[in-house]
Each structure stands twice: as C-alpha cells, then as structure tokens.
C-alpha cells in the first residue's frame, strides 16, 4: 500500500539547466552524494516537470502554506515588526501566528489585531511575483487549484475564481461565531474602517518593496502618529441575525462555516477530477506539509497510484517526499519553489 511510511527524499540545490534523465534513477540519485551531481539531478527533475507540464491534458495544483512563505508572506521577522511591533511590545508574542491565538481582554483589542492581520495577509499582494509566475505557467492549460491557504493569492494573481477550491476558509470572510446560520460575509470594507480608526493610512504607493494589492493597497504608519491598539466598539462586527460577535471564517474548530460558495467550489473540483479521469493529469504539489496531509498530499498520492496516466510532482524545500510505490511516475524537487518556478519559466 502506497501510504506506508516509505518515501524518497531529494536533496541538492539548483543553479543551471540540464537534460532530462530517467525518473526512477533520479529518485535514487541522492545515494551518490556530491554537490555538483545534486545540482544536475535537481535540474534534470525540473526539466522533467517542464516536459510533463507541456504534455499534460490538465493540471491540478495543490498548494500549502509553504507556497505563500516562498512568495514572501512570512509571519515573523520584518513584516511582523513593521505592522505589529506595538502589540509585540505590550503582549510579548513574537509572530503573527502566535498573536492570532492570544486571549485579548476585549473585543476592541482583538479586532484591532485581527484587522491588521487580515489586511496585510489578504488584501495586500505578497512581496514577490511567485503566484503571478505560476499563473503564467498554467494559464493556457486546463487547470484547477486545491489549496489549504486562506490568503487568496491565486485569485489576486489572475487565476479564475471558478477554478479555485479554498478548503480551509478565507481571511476575507466573517461568519457568526456560534454559528447560528451558514452564511459568510465579505469583510474588506469593515477591515479598512478598523485600520483607519487605529491611525493607519491606506496608500496607493508601495511601501518597503511590498507591492500594493490589486483591490486597494499598502498599509502605512503616518509619521508622528500614535497607532492605537484598539478600535471603537461600534466597529466590532456582530452577526446580523443573532447579534453575537462575528469570527473569522477559518477552519479552527467545529464552528467553521462551509457556505454555499464552499460547496459549489467542492462540486466544481469533483467534476473536474471526474471529467479528466484517464487523461494525462499532472498533480503539481507546492509547499504542502504534514499539518493536514489528508486534504492534498495523500489524495494526490492516491490519484498517482491508481490513475494510469497521472504524474505527481512535489516541490517543497526540505520536504520533497515521494512514496516509493509511485516513484516511477513522480518526482520531488527539494528546492525553493520560487527558484524552481523561475527555472521552469526560463526553459
């Protein structure tokens, strides 16, 4: 059974072009060692990916958190310091993710934090054009995207929203916290109001090389302005039906709302897969780890094992694993996704 814990791991970096090599030999190449050889092995794999992409009747992209990280959407470091240094100083957490679980004393503080979190990760584009470059690779193919990411970078890069299935929610949606009903609500307007109430400006200009989002733009701290860590009580979002506080539409527990849009996307994905059964189907997995492997990774392995004309690609620096059972119809590239995509565009 291919779900046994038998995997092949690929190591080595990429720096130049190379000719296509036999997949099975490449999947065992790391037994030989040597940096220059590893470079050639990695680049040969990229050539195979390019070849399979060109030959494919359709492409299914499976995207995890590692893809947005490769695009520059980091939750710590400079981005965190730029937008959350005041929260960090007061509460002691060191990254956005940790702050998202902090038990704030008031809803006014909670939503001050989350309005920043949502805006910089949902309504601003990532610092690099990685998603745009991926779109260039597949825009003329019959494609579908399955993703556990909630930042909507695919749609911002030009991917058809009818070909996207966001399984875990969307930073751009609110829901009732109970929930008392299965509807979600766009939050961009109210998020902007929360930010303005804290003293931020929303500028059309780029800030510190982080390019503005297509819907609206960069978040700026005006000079000589004291940014507030709270919002007015009237800006705390409440359910229009029961009056309870709203929450983010993120799959954190059993209160997650799967609205009509979620089910329509799931149905479109299912039909896409059924319509392409038996065709040359490329499963392109990008930045998927092991937090929720059953959504993308394990399903892609099953399809590769059971569908004769399927081919599986895993690109993920440090986690490019392929089950031995499908090693002859799969390839793993242990390299930064942005580097690989640039190589693919250059071929």
Residue ranges of model-derived segments:
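Conserved catalytic alpha/beta core of Sir2/sirtuin-type deacylases, generalized to analogous enzyme cores
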Residues: 2-14, 19-347
């Amino acid at each position: 059974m291919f779900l046994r814990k038998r995997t092949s791991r690929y190591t080595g970096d990429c720096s130049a072009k190379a000719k296509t090599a036999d997949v099975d030999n490449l999947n065992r190449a790391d037994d030989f060692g040597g940096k220059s050889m590893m470079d050639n092995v990695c680049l040969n794999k990229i050539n195979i990916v390019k070849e399979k992409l060109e030959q494919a009747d359709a492409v299914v992209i499976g995207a995890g958190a590692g893809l947005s990280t490769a695009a520059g959407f980091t939750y710590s470091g400079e981005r965190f310091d730029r937008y959350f240094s005041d929260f960090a100083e007061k509460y002691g957490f060191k990254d956005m993710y940790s702050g998202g679980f902090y038990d704030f004393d008031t809803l006014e503080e909670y939503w001050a934090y989350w309005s920043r979190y949502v805006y910089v990760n949902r309504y601003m584009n990532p610092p690099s054009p990685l998603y745009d470059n991926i779109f260039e690779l597949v825009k003329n193919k019959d494609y579908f995207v399955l993703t556990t990411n909630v930042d909507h970078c695919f749609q911002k890069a030009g991917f058809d929203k009818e070909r996207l299935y966001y399984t875990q929610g969307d930073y751009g949606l609110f829901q009732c916290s109970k929930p008392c009903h299965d509807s979600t609500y766009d939050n961009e307007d109210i998020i902007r109001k929360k930010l303005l109430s804290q003293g931020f400006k929303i500028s059309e200009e780029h800030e510190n090389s982080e390019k503005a989002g297509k819907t609206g733009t960069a978040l700026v701290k005006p000079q000589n302005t004291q940014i507030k860590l709270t919002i007015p009580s009237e800006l705390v979002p409440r359910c229009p039906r029961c009056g309870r506080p709203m929450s983010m539409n993120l799959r954190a527990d059993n209160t997650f709302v799967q609205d009509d849009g979620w089910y329509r996307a799931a149905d479109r994905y299912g039909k896409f897969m059924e319509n392409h059964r038996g065709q040359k189907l490329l499963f392109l997995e990008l930045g998927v780890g092991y937090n929720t492997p059953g959504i993308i990774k394990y399903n892609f392995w099953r399809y590769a094992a059971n569908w004769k004309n399927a081919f599986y690609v895993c690109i993920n620096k440090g986690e490019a694993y392929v089950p031995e059972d499908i090693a002859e119809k799969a390839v793993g590239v242990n390299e930064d996704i942005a580097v690989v995509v640039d190589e693919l565009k250059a071929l």
